[in-house]
Structure formats: C-alpha cells, structure tokens
Curated annotation (Swiss-Prot):
<comment type="subunit">
    <text>Component of a SNARE complex consisting of sed5, bos1, bet1 and sec22 or ykt6. Interacts with YIF1 and YIP1.</text>
</comment>
<comment type="similarity">
    <text>Belongs to the BOS1 family.</text>
</comment>
<keyword id="KW-0472">Membrane</keyword>
<dbReference type="GO" id="GO:0000139">
    <property type="term" value="C:Golgi membrane"/>
</dbReference>
<dbReference type="GO" id="GO:0000149">
    <property type="term" value="F:SNARE binding"/>
</dbReference>
<dbReference type="InterPro" id="IPR027027">
    <property type="entry name" value="GOSR2/Membrin/Bos1"/>
</dbReference>
<keyword id="KW-0256">Endoplasmic reticulum</keyword>
<comment type="function">
    <text>SNARE required for targeting and fusion of ER-derived transport vesicles with the Golgi complex.</text>
</comment>
<dbReference type="GO" id="GO:0005737">
    <property type="term" value="C:cytoplasm"/>
</dbReference>
<keyword id="KW-0813">Transport</keyword>
<keyword id="KW-1133">Transmembrane helix</keyword>
<dbReference type="GO" id="GO:0006888">
    <property type="term" value="P:endoplasmic reticulum to Golgi vesicle-mediated transport"/>
</dbReference>
<feature type="transmembrane region" description="Helical; Anchor for type IV membrane protein">
    <location>
        <begin position="214"/>
        <end position="234"/>
    </location>
</feature>
<feature type="topological domain" description="Vesicular">
    <location>
        <position position="235"/>
    </location>
</feature>
<protein>
    <recommendedName>
        <fullName>Protein transport protein bos1</fullName>
    </recommendedName>
</protein>
<dbReference type="Pfam" id="PF12352">
    <property type="entry name" value="V-SNARE_C"/>
</dbReference>
<dbReference type="GO" id="GO:0031902">
    <property type="term" value="C:late endosome membrane"/>
</dbReference>
C-alpha cells in the first residue's frame, strides 16, 4: 500500500509540473485569461490531492515495522514536502502574473471603449469645451468605477472556473481512491485466507469497506449537487 501511495504522489508531482509549465507558457504568451484560470483551478485541485496523499503516506510510514524501509520512506516524505513548497511558491508567483495580465487587459479594453464613445459623442473632434473640463473628474470617477467592476467580474469568473475544476479533480480523486480501497480489500482478503484470520476480523474489514463506499458515494453526490447549483447560478 505504501508503494501505491508513493507512486500516486510521484504522478501528482509530474502532473503539477506539467500544468505549471503550461501556465507559465500561457503567461509568457499572454493567452486568454479564461483558459489560464481553468489551468489554475486544475493545479489548485492537484495541490489539494497531493497534500492529502503525502499526509496519508506519512501516516502509513509511521506504522512501518522494518527500520530500513521506514527510514527510506521518511526521507522520501521530506523530499516530497520540500518539493511541494517549491512548486506552491512558483504557482503563487504565476497566479500573480495572471492577475496582472487580466487587469491590464481589462483596463486597456475599458479605456479603448471609453475613447471610442467620447469620439462619437464629441462633434468637434479633439476640441475641449468648458463643460468637458468641468465634467472631467466625474468622468474619471465613473471610469474608475467601471474598471473596478470589470476587475471584480474577472476575478469572480476566475474563481468560479477554479471551483468547477477543483470539483472535477476531487471527484476524480474520489474515484481513484475507491479503486485503491477495492484493490487493498482484495489483498487483505487474500492474506486473510492465507494466514487464517478470524471471521470477526473479516467482518470488520467488510464493514469498513461499506463505510468507505458510503463516504465515496456521498462525496460524489455532493459534488454533483454543487455543480448543479453553480450551473443554476451562472444561468
């Protein structure tokens, strides 16, 4: 089981690294901020799954009886946690760049639309009247309000995309954990037949397996309910 968790953590690290590289390329190319927000949501969900998997691996290593294996696994956990912190710092840096790109893009679009509207409203081109000078501060405050509103909507859209992607990743992680539990149960039952474990112990294992299934299906149901509520809210 410890090898399974180790391989799972390794795959998550590889997946996060690929996603961070993709996000970094998107930042350099100043790609669509919506697609970048989707990548951010995927990475956030992967970090949650990784942190939980490392904790599970650490908990299992503490119960290891062979000193050599326990020492080796403890070193692996330390390396995992250090790499986790490094990747998280890089992710925070890239998220800051994405926010800067989105704000600059929104500000540019609003200023462009504002200039276009002013050119249509003014029949005298670039000439400045006393009324326009008086109304200048009001126009600036209204423009600042539009910028703030646009930035808020952009952040809200990014958060919704991130939440949806996180829910999808959590659901996938639940499915994967269900498969791991099923495989573990099979191994335990085979070992029980070999070692002659009592029926009482087997019944406890079966009961725990049923509880895990209930938790899995309840979690999946809650995720689908959240998806439905978000869908209704977006409509």
């Amino acid at each position: 089981m410890s090898n399974t968790l180790y391989n799972h953590c390794t795959k998550l690290f590889q997946s996060i690294q690929r996603s961070l590289d993709e996000l970094e390329r998107g930042v350099q190319d100043e790609s669509n901020t919506i697609s970048l927000a989707g990548i951010q949501g995927q990475i956030s969900a992967s970090f949650l799954s990784l942190s939980r998997s490392i904790d599970d691996y650490d908990s299992m290593v503490q119960r290891e009886l062979v000193p050599a294996k326990k020492k080796k696994a403890t070193i692996r956990i330390q390396e995992f946690r250090q790499k986790h912190v490094q990747l998280l710092e890089k992710f925070d840096e890239l998220k800051a760049h994405v926010r800067d790109i989105a704000q600059a893009k929104n500000r540019k679009e609003l200023l462009g639309r504002r200039g276009y509207v002013n050119s249509l409203d003014s029949p005298y081109g670039n000439s400045t009247t006393d009324a326009e000078i008086v109304e200048g501060p009001s126009d600036l405050s209204r423009q600042d309000g539009l910028l703030k509103e646009h930035d808020f909507l952009g952040r809200a859209e990014s958060q919704v995309d991130e939440f949806l992607e996180r829910g999808r990743m959590i659901l996938g992680d639940l499915v994967e954990q269900g498969s791991v539990l099923k495989a573990t149960k099979t191994k335990v039952l085979n070992a029980a037949n070999t070692l002659g474990i009592t029926r009482h112990t087997l019944s406890l294992i079966n009961r725990r397996s049923k509880q895990d299934k209930i938790i899995f299906y309840c979690g999946a149901f809650l995720v689908f309910v959240l998806f439905y509520l978000i869908y209704r809210w977006l409509r």
